[in-house]
């Protein structure tokens, strides 16, 4: 075979981008779950790739692309050019480039399940699952769809993996979440869903942007060529991929804005991924207009699908993996049968003048793939559950998997994070800032007579956004010593409910600051009135002021006590 440099480079760049999707999935899942499980999430995503790579090399590639029959490929040995160097290789692409490209696709399907089973799965059990999906489940269905199997022989079209990758992972996630059961306190006794917010939506958003960026390689490089018509096709694929994701995101934003009275951040991020998943099967064979329609539909599917799975089926999916990958993977598969313009298929879609044939082919292939994954993953998860166990104990789940599964006190050591339990016998100290904005006093006022000036401590709990203005105001009234501590307040804003992924929030830990001031000469009431004037907005959450009597103050450096200990002298 004569190799093409441009085709080889294109495939290798695509493989590198698809590999980096692992970072995107890790960030999305970490951000959408609680801080006490962040390290566990990272380890699971790492192991998906590191277990899947050798397994796919040893067995999976042969099952998927080996010369066998319509049902399963024939394993001719480990994946080497000598064993599989002919047959299924794309034109001009060396075996090793094709192997790594297919390896990263396998790992992508495996990692989808991590989010749906987050925060309560045994790490060992998850590793066993990861091995099995890369060893058997994904390669066999992949052979049917991409390896010359009986589904592909029907005329089935799944260009980059809405069905073969995402729906397979999404259905596996659904089965795993069902068998595993919901997290502790996810549902009330009467079955009402409770919101369990992720600890870092910023990290989650970073993950979505990484995935969106890498999806251009996921879909674009699936041409496995940059010669002839593939050059034009690659550009079109980039456009349809981007358009579907963008339209889906806007659609979700509008839906949540109407339903929840505010645009939901995490659901909008899921909307981006839903659009990407839905367009993946037909990105080469649908028009930009059809891609936009697919984006709109995927936005509706992800919002109402996630709500249905959570509130009606009572299936706990912390990151929305089933709604994003399972439901939209299935929809994306069917969308080819609806919107294909015939440029990448032997038929046109139902809505583009091709009749029911193409839609029927897509529907049949989808149902067969779902049935395969449901049966195999049910067996795998049930065997794991009844042997080594699938779920951690209640004690381990409450404490957090970082601590119990990995011996990690916190993935954020050195930071004060909500939801991270403090190990027994230790304490977590929040950062403390001591502010002295004024110059040291040159002289000490005359010592007041006994009992004239008492010592008073004023404590203020408030939001951080007005801290600078507050410190300036305190300086102006003569308060020069202020201690500020980052704290977390537990509460809910009455009369203005907030929502997380469609579920009304009951109570949450909110970042606040605790300001401590000890005064003697400065009148307490003046401190209080100044604080009220600066911090008041009229909104719930402005804060509270607490006033305490102090028996004595001792300055350690000089030994001075009482009033003198408060004076900032040289």
List PLM regions with ranges.
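Positively charged, small/polar-rich N-terminal and surface patches that mediate targeting and assembly
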Residues: 404-411, 422-570
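Glycine- and aromatic-enriched membrane alpha-helices
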Residues: 1-448
């Amino acid at each position: 075979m004569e190799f093409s440099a441009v085709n080889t480079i294109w495939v290798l760049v695509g493989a590198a981008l698809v590999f980096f999707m692992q970072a995107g999935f890790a960030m999305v899942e970490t951000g959408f779950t609680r801080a006490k499980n962040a390290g566990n999430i990272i380890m699971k995503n790492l192991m998906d790739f590191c277990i899947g790579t050798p397994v796919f090399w040893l067995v999976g590639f042969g099952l998927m692309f080996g010369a066998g029959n319509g049902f399963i490929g024939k394993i001719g040995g480990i994946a080497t050019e000598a064993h599989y160097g002919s047959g299924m290789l794309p034109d001009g692409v060396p075996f090793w480039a094709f192997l790594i490209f297919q390896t990263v696709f396998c790992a992508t399907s495996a990692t989808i399940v991590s989010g749906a089973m987050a925060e309560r799965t045994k790490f060992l059990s998850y590793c066993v699952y990861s091995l099995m999906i890369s060893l058997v489940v994904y390669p066999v269905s992949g052979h049917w769809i991409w390896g010359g199997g009986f589904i592909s022989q029907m005329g089935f079209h799944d260009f980059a993996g809405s069905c073969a990758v995402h729906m397979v992972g999404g259905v596996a996630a659904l089965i795993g979440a069902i068998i595993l059961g919901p997290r502790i306190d996810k549902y009330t006794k009467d079955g009402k869903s409770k919101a369990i917010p992720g600890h870092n939506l910023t990290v989650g958003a970073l993950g979505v942007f990484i995935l969106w960026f890498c999806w251009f390689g996921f879909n674009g490089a699936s041409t496995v060529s940059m010669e002839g018509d593939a050059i034009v096709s690659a550009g079109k694929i980039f456009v349809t991929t981007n358009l579907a994701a963008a339209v889906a995101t806007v659609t979700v934003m509008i839906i949540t804005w109407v339903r929840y009275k505010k645009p939901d951040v995490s659901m909008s991020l899921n909307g981006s991924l839903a659009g990407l998943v839905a367009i993946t099967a037909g990105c080469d064979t649908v028009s930009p207009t059809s891609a936009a329609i697919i984006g709109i539909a995927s936005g509706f599917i992800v919002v109402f699908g996630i709500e249905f799975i959570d509130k009606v089926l009572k299936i706990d999916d912390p990151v929305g993996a089933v709604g994003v990958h399972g439901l939209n993977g299935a929809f994306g598969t069917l969308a080819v049968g609806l919107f294909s313009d015939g440029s990448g298929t032997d038929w046109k879609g139902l809505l583009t003048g091709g009749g029911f044939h193409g839609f029927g082919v897509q529907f049949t292939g989808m149902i067969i793939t779902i049935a395969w994954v449901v049966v195999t993953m049910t067996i795998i998860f049930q065997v794991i559950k009844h042997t080594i166990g699938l779920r951690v104990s209640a004690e381990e789940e409450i404490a957090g998997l970082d601590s119990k599964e990995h011996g990690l006190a916190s993935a954020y050591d050195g930071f004060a994070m909500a939801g991270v339990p403090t190990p027994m016998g230790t304490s977590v100290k929040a950062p403390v800032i001591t502010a002295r904005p004024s110059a040291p006093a040159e002289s000490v006022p005359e010592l007041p007579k006994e009992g004239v000036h008492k010592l008073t401590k004023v404590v203020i709990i408030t939001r951080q956004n007005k801290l600078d203005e507050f410190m300036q105001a305190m300086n102006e009234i003569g308060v020069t010593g202020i201690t500020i501590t980052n704290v977390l307040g537990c509460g809910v804003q009455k009369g203005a409910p907030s929502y997380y992924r469609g579920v009304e929030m009951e109570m949450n830990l909110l970042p606040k600051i605790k300001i401590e001031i000890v005064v003697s000469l400065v009148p307490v009431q003046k401190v209080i009135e100044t604080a009220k004037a600066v911090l008041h907005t009229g909104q719930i959450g402005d804060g509270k002021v607490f006033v305490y009597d102090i028996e004595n103050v001792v300055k350690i450096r000089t030994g001075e006590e009482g009033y003198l200990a408060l004076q900032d002298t040289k």
